[in-house]
Amino acid sequence: MPFDGVDQETVNRLPRLSELHDAYGVQVNSISVDELFDLYERTGFLYPDKAARLLPHLGRVKENWRRMFDAGESLLYVFTAGDQREGRAALAVFRTTHRGWTYQHLVSEDNPFGSRSVMLAAGAAMILKGSDESAQNWFRPENRFPARVFGSMIEAIGGSLSSVQNYAYFSIPRTVALPSDQGIRVVPYDAAHNKDLCSLAELTRGRVFVTAEELATDVPLKSLDLLYRRVGLRRTRHVWLAYRQKWPVGAAIAYRGPLGLNFSFLENRCDLLLASDLTETEQQRVAAGLLGAAVTAYDTFELDFIPLVAGESAMPVLLNLGAQFVRHYCQCIWLKDGYPRSYRHVDSFYSKVLDRARKKTVQPSALLESVR
């Protein structure tokens, strides 16, 4: 839809795309993978528990990042700002669907000016390129910075163009024994199921989720996978639906991609969708059937567990099935028509951060907690 007057004014004030790097004082993909991971360690983003999970696979993870860099800016771009004296800031953005991107791993060496630069440059690039349809960010609700920026996105953009959903993140062993139930029919997705999948996803996750995840247009992510194949990687999606009689009551959406694009392995998560009118007993039957099918998508997965994301109401059921609760996560999504508003929202937030930093009423490091 066309921008309103305020949004158009925001767009008109942006630099040309060719001038973006100089205008914001940023560089794109100029940092090496080793330097970037060193920055993650220095800023505490790779804290001990997270580093311990990555360490056994660090060589593979770094190689995956290098291949993503080899694709230019078609799969991954890392904005950096600042220098050794001022402190560096970085933001990574990777292509999660054919026309959607995930903002992640915002870090700063006590340089709020650099953090502002990389965030606004990323937002401006999305607007100026004009080819992207959605952006998203995953954050832990207890992390103050992302909770204040991304957690308030609906207030800034509106519920028709953005969403913020709370989820529980689990690890479930790939070898877990799951009960089967003849009363629940689980089927692999094909095009004939698209209406059921989109309807269920809209009821459980919202219309913004359906749009951003491109469920109506490319469930297996075929177009995206072609881009990843160019650098010897894969990005696919596998779906199963659960039916009670003829009605869809659940779905498992298994994302597969290069290990470690996200340090919580969200690029390889399994999203579990359960109809809201199910009893706890029915939830367990449906979840068991879906997970029993979805585990086959992880036959070649490097980890011994599957990253599992579900609504918080499913926690008792999944614990009963052998899943281990890891943490709470929020997924913030904003759509293309909301980009100018999200840009103003981030700009306004950082104006306050910088004002406080200048006055030294609080330390910038307290305001710039990394998105973990």
PLM ranges: what are they?
Residues 1-26, 129, 297-298, 314-321:
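Structured alpha-helical
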Residues 11, 35-39, 125-142, 146-147, ...:
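Compact beta-rich and alpha/beta scaffold cores in large eukaryotic transport/transcription complexes
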Residues 13-63, 179-219:
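Short amphipathic alpha-helix that is part of the acyltransferase structural core
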Residues 41-103, 205-270:
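A conserved beta-strand-loop-helix scaffold within acyl/acetyltransferase catalytic domains
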Residues 64, 77, 176-203, 207, ...:
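A cross-taxonomic marker for long C-terminal extensions/tails that follow the last structured domain
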Residues 89, 94-161, 259-326:
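Acyl-donor binding region in acyl/amide transferases
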Residues 156-174, 326-338:
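Conserved catalytic-core motifs of GNAT/GCN5-like acyltransferases
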Residues 328-372:
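C-terminal functional modules
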